[in-house]
Each structure stands twice: as structure tokens, then as C-alpha cells.
Amino acid sequence: ISIFDLPIEQYPDITPPVVEVSTTYPGADAETVNNAVATPVSQSIMGVSDMLYMQATSANDGSMNLQVTFDIGSDPNMDAIFTQNNVSTALSQLPASVTQQGVTTRKTMTGFLIVYSLTSDGRYTGDFLSNYAYINIQNELLKIDGVGKVDIMGAGEYAMRIWLKPDLLDYYKISLDEVFAAVEAQGGIFPAGKFGGEPAAGDVTYTYTVTMPPQIYDAEQFGDIIISTTPEGEQVRLSDIADVALGSRQYGVESLFNSDPTALLVIYQQPGSNAVDVGNSVKAEMERLSKRFPDGITYTSMVDATTSIEAGVKDIFVTLIIALILVIAIIFLFLQDWRATLIPLLAIPVSIIGAFALFPLLGFSINIISLLGMVLAIGLVVDDAIVVVEAVQVNIEKGLSAKQATVEAMHSVSSPIVATTVVLLAVFIPVSFMGSITGLLFQQFSISIAVSVCISSFNALTLSPALCALLLKPRPKVQKGFFAAFNRWFGKRTEEYTSATTRFIGHLKRTGGIVAVTLAAIAVIWHFLPSGFLPDEDQGYVMVFVQTPEASSLQTTVKAMQRVDELVRQRPDVEATSFAAGFNMLAGIASSNSGIIFVKLVDYSQRSKTSSQIASALTEELYVAVPEAVSYAFISPSIPGLGVTSGITLQVQDLEGRGTEFLADETMRFMDSLRKQPQIGSVTTQFNAGIPQRRIEVDKEKALAQGVPLRSFYKTMSTLLGGSYINNFNRFGKLYQTYIQAAPEYRRDKYSLESYFVDDGQGNSIPVSSFTTVRDTTGVEFVSQFNLYRSIELTVNPAAKVSTGQAMDAIEAVAADVLPEAVGTTWSGLSYQEKTASGSSGAVYLLAIVFVFLTLSALYNSWGLPLAILLSVPLAVLGALLFVGAAYLVSPEFINNIYMQISLVMLIGLSAKNAILVVEYADQLFFEKNMDLKAATIEAARLRMRPIMMTAFSFILGVMPLIFASGVYATARNIMGMALVGGMLLATMLGIFIYPALYYLVARVGKFERKRELKQKES
């Protein structure tokens, strides 16, 4: 029941909550928005509880977007409330037009969940499609629990557009203030009250509600607004001085789907929500809404993060089944009896299903980490049952009955079973208390296995003995066929092993030397093996960023993007494409010279290349094929919500407020130095301080001499060139805004100012051109702040076969060498989390080893036995490093990342578990049976060889499918499989010699023979 009710997601809830604050300052440039809006808002938010960092972006379209990233584990709802409370204290400092627009605060994620393309068969325009989505789809999707926001990329939302003709304003001697006043008065909505309302006169019989004429809502009605009346009685209406149309609130974005107009619906989930549940709800709602679509309108899924999640979970389930089959095969090979095989086989469903049953209580979900834990648990949970069955069978072959054999066996194996279980718990439970993303990933993995191991141990001490007494029978004295040949072969190997062990354990210096060489080899390989955080995974889509030369028009960008789009669609591994021109997704701003293409790839089974390989190939192809634009493809980061791209994200900050020019110069110098480093593949930034602009120089003395109020002049320029918001109107059941701006032909270039006039307050129109001069200049398209410092964001991609960890170290070294004290650097997005987690792996390993040592010391009341057990751990670590290092020479994806670290923690427990089987039994034979130390050691090694080989190879075969996994999240499985197989192979093949040798070494150094004599005298 729990399995079917558990939520399915890519990762546990490890994404830091993000609260977004956004607003618009109509007509303002980036610097103005930054100074007037972003700075006061950022100052009010700074220091809010649980904040990690915040980044504000102010753009030339007047928009301000600020994202506050909070600590993992904080409550997103409370984060949003605290942020809103702080923002409210800054509202009084903001310009009036900003507060009129409203300042929105909402919790969201930076990574999108699903992207839909709404298209038609040619009957509808992009304007219609976008507004159909605004009116009929957006709010319905926002109602879904877990949906954070729904952005629509395409033609803007409807707005009443008043396109003024400045020369006609001058002709009719009408000021802008008169136009504003008329539209506000005649286009607004006003209450009227009641006739006979209370307190009423004594003779009032009825009360009537009074209504005014309904608010106007269409272009014709707005055009009929009376602006003024001439002395001759002629009325000047709005349509006489302006073109009025139902247009868009914002222009500048054009979207196409396979060359047809489209509206892109970008759906983001809320922090803490379940991706698959939210995605399924969104899909069901879209299917319901599509039944009401007008004829000719359809929708296509371009990006669906849930598809890769579900496919990845399905693949891991398949891996789990394959592992189960292989484990059963190896058990049957060694036990050679279906009855004996059945006993450990029953331990698997009991332990695995039992663990799933506890998932709801633990707050766990079915995700990549927990499922990988279950795959590895298959090889673990059979170990205890195998040890029991093997011991019982040995006793039965001595002539004991099944019941007596079971009782006798449990006397000898109960202690090792408890010990190995305690060791595994000592490894897994402490590391689950780590913080950060790393700690949360370790938590899901380690607790999943710990629960399975506990159930397995309980099963081995209760159910397995009962089944042994009921099911096991003496095996035939004479065996034939395959099993007979296998037993003869294994018997010879056991004799050879016993002989080799007898010769080996006597050389104490050799044993110590092997341990020392192993530790030295680990240090060398660890130093040279690249490190990283999380591998990039194939999510079924790529994105292509396209950028034309600075200041290019939207039409120029659309043409370039159509060329890129056409080339991308020709690839056989591409299913569909859809793009939005006029939007810079990397910077998060509207930009006429930028655009993004969503590329949906064909199913994983129908293509030979991963999304990363396709992105690399596209980047190379487009660089040559489309020289008129800069185009490069990229994939999303492995953890949704931590940035847009998968590269390294770095913020370069102006710590002393020296200005944009200073910061830009230092950043360019820094980037040039980075490009010379062998660890760096590419360095890019969306920031550019050299964008062609025009500056209007105002001769204030001349303007004032002509009686021009400067406030009126600035308002005139802001309104005519940038547009101004007036009021709202209702239509289609929604509230829309009214904007006033000069018609396009009156803001074509600097010569358009010749038709602009300002009223001097005495009825005279003063031409703007009489006291202004337009000069060419350069400036920025957007301004960024990071933690209140002016900043420039860099995206760095490591060179081939260089990990992100190596690249980040190189970046820090260059920054320390090149940048002055006035300029600082800091990480953001996934890079911030990686840097926070870096260095924690050593603490994890140390914590695991210390807890194992202390646990064993308490269990055995000895310092020597735990030391003998733990000195075998380096072999497993060396095996993992050798295998992963060899794989790295073939593929750069095999590095020391978090999956490698998880594997090493597991190997600490596994190698200690195998060592316990030999060391504890040798200790029993020596102290309880009074055998000679060397003889006890050799006998323990001989008797424990078969169960060690059986449990080790059942685990190795159980994780072997991970090495050969392909498809979704294959990289994570490949790395874990390689590390675990390598570690267990070396720990098994060499460990069976090292385990007894280490016990003998510790016993000799610790003078165990003297201790036994003292115990015997005391007794």
C-alpha cells in the first residue's frame, strides 16, 4: 500500500526555497530602476531570517526582479511572509508609478517544470493565442496545489494602448496633463451611493442603489473620450489626437513553434512540492481545458521534467529486478538447494517492502536516491540469512538434525550478525545528520539502507532460523553434474587459499607494509581524481540561447532565430522546437537581441547520444552555420531550481561602489585571465556595458528661461518614449491596464523629438528640440546586484575531462591573483551548494570510521579487534578509486562526486562487515576454544571463506547492473556501480588474505596470548 501511495520525485526535497519580488517602473532605464527600486527593496530584505543570498536584476524595460534564496529546510511559506513584511517597509520609498503597478512577492522555483506550446492551424494570431492563455489557462493552472507561477512567453497581455501623436497635441494646444485627466475621469469607474440611504429622512419609504454609466472597455469607447472643447464649441476627442487600440501590455517578445505563431506556457513548481504529483495535475488540467479550446488550437509539451523523473524511476526499478535475479542466481550457486535458497530469498521482500512501509513515517519519497539505496540493499539484506543458512548446513553435514543444527549455528552466528548490523548502523545513521544538500542526499540513502538492514537482521535472528529448522535437509553425499564440478573447483581454491593464508599471516611486516602502501595509493589517486558535485543528467531536452549583435531589433533577432530553429529541427534526434525571441533567459530580462529555443528530443531509446552530447554538437554546428548570431546549446542543472544552466555560476562584485565602468573593466580582465587557464573551457557573461544608446542632454538654463517646468518635460519624455500607466478597465472577466505612449512613427529616432512639445504653463508650446541635444553613447542593458553589491554574473564551463571542482579551484586562484581588493567573487546557484558541500566528504568518512570504531570497541570491550577490522577498510576504498579512476580515463563523467562519496561510506560498512566474520570467529576460537593463535586465525579464515565469497559476490552481482545502466540518470548509477563493484572486488579478493593477517598482527602486537593466560588464571 505504501509503495503505491508514496510520491515520486527526482530528488528528495533538497532545493533551497526561493522567494521572488518583482515590479515594473514604466519607461525607466536599468540604472534608474536599480537606484530607485532595486536598492531600497534589497536594503529592506537584507538580513531576513534564513536567507542565503539574494540577487536583483533591473532591466531597460523598467522591470525589476529580485530573487531571495533561503536555507535548505526553511519553511517556504514563512520565507515568503517574512520577505513580504520586509518589502512593505520599502514601499514608501518607491516611485508612485511603481506602487501603482504593484510589488509582487511570491515563493517560486527558478527551474521550470513543464513548458507547453499553444499553437493554431493558422486561424489565430500570436496575440490571440497569448491572451487566450492569459484568460482561460493561466489562472486554472495557478489553482493547482504546488504550481508556483505560470509565465506566458509570446505577445503580451491585453492592454488599452493610446498611441499619441505629439504634433496633433501641439496643433490643438492640449497638454499631456489634460489627456491624463480626461482618461482618468472618463475611463475610470466610480461609486455613486444610494437614494434614501441611512440615516434617512423620516418620510423615506424606499432605498435605491444608484449606479453610474458602466466603465468603458473597448477602443471605440476610449476614442470617444472628450479631451477639450474649443472656444468655437468643437470637441476634441481622444481619437483626434491618438490611435486607440486593444494591444499588448508589453511588446518585444515573439514566439514561434515550428515556424508558426505560438504562446509558450512556462510552468514553475513551488518549493517543497512534489514534481510528479504537480506535473500530473497540470497535465490532467490541460487535457480538461483543451476540450474547450476553439477549433484549430492545440498544445504540445516541449519540456516535461516529470517524464525524465518517471523514466528514471522506472529504469531503476528494472535495475532492482535484474539485481534481484542475479543475487538469487549466486545464492543458488553456492547453496545448491532450492530450500536453502528460499530462506535468504524471502529476506529480500521482507526487508525491502518493510523499508517502503516506513517511508511515509520518515517523510521519504520514491526518488533516485532512495531507490538506489534499495538496489544496494538487495545485496545487503541477504547476507545475514546466508550466514545463518551456511552455518546450519555445515552442522547438518556433521550429522545433527535440522533443529539441533539450527540451535548450534545460532550460538555461533548470532553475535556476528548483531555486530555487523550495529556496524552498518554506525556507518549510516551518523552521516544522515549532516546539513546542506549533501547531508539530505546522504540522509535518504543511508536511512533507506539502515531500515532495510535492521529488518534483515531481525529476520535473520527470527524467521531464518525457523525456516532452516523446517526446510533444510542433508544434501546428497554424492553430487553429480555442474554442482559437483563447482564444489571440487571451490574446494581446491579453498585449500589453496588456506595454504596461502598460512604462509602469509606470519609475515607481520608484510601485512603492515600492505596497509601502508594501500593508504599511500589512496592518497595519490584521491589527489589526481577530479572532484565534482552532481553529474549532469539527460532530461530529454536541451535549450539553445541565441544572441544577435547589441541593439539589434526584434525583427533581426527573429530572422536569425528562424535560421537556427530550421537547422536544429533537421537533426534526427530532435522531435520539435519552439522559441521565444526578445527574451534573455540567462539574464532573466526582456532583450530585443536575445532569444531562447526549447528543443524537445526524441525518446531516449530512439537516439544514441545524450542531451549533453547533442548540446555540444549543436553549439559547434551553429557556430559555423549561423555567423550572424552567437548561439550555444545547454542543458538544465541536475537539480531543478538551482539556476538555468548546468555550468559554474560566479558573481563578480563591486565591494566599494566604484561604479559600473570600473567593475566591467575588472571583470573583462578577470575573464581574459580565466580563458588562459587549462582547466577552463569557456567563460561567458550576459553583461555588456557597451550597448549603443542615446543620451538626451538638457540645457536646463535655456529650458527654464523659456518657462518650461522641468518636471513637465521629464514626464513628457517618459510618457512619449517609454509609456505611462493611467488606470485599469475590465474586460473578459479580467482587469487590464491602460497605457499612453507616442505612436511608433513618433519615436523612430532622435529626429522624432522635433515633434515633441512642452507646455510652459501659459498656454504656449515649447519645442523639446529647442533645449535638448541627442548624443550617441553606450550603456548597460541590465544592472545586477548580489547581496546589495553591484555585480556581474559569469558562467564558466570546465574544459574537457576537467571537473567542476577543479575548475572552481582554478577560478579562485585566478581571482586571488588578478582582482583588486575592491572587487570580490562569490558563488551562486548550484555552484554555491557545491562549494558549501566541498570538504564535507572528509568529515563524513571520518565520522563513519570513528563511529564504527567506537561501536565495535563497546561491543567487544576491546580496542584491538576494532582496529583489526577497520584496517581492512582501505582496501575497499582503493578498489573504488582504482575502478572509478580507470573509468575516468575513458569518460570524464566518472569523477569523485557525491555518488562516489555515498559509495565509499557504504564500502566502509561492507568491508568492516566481511572482516567481522573472520576476526570475531578467530577471536572465539582463540579465547573460547583455546586454540593456538595462528591455528585459530587460519581455521576462521578457512571456515568463513565460503560465506564471505557468497555474500560479497551476491552484493557485487546485485550492483553490477548499475555499471551498464543507460538512459535517464544513468551517470549516477554508473558511478555508484563502478565504485561499489571495484571496492568490493578488491576488498574480497585481497581482503580474505588481509582479514586474518590483520587479526594475527593485532593479536601479536596486543599480546592476546598473555591476556588469555591472565583470564584463565583469574577463572
Please tell me what each predicted stretch does.
Residues 302, 309, 313, 317, ...:
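Helix-loop junctions and hydrophobic alpha-helical segments within the transmembrane domains
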Residues 1-8, 413, 482-535, 942:
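Signature of alpha-helical transmembrane segments and their immediate interfacial
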Residues 378-392, 413-433, 440-483, 597, ...:
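Transmembrane alpha-helices and their membrane-interface boundaries in multi-pass membrane transporters
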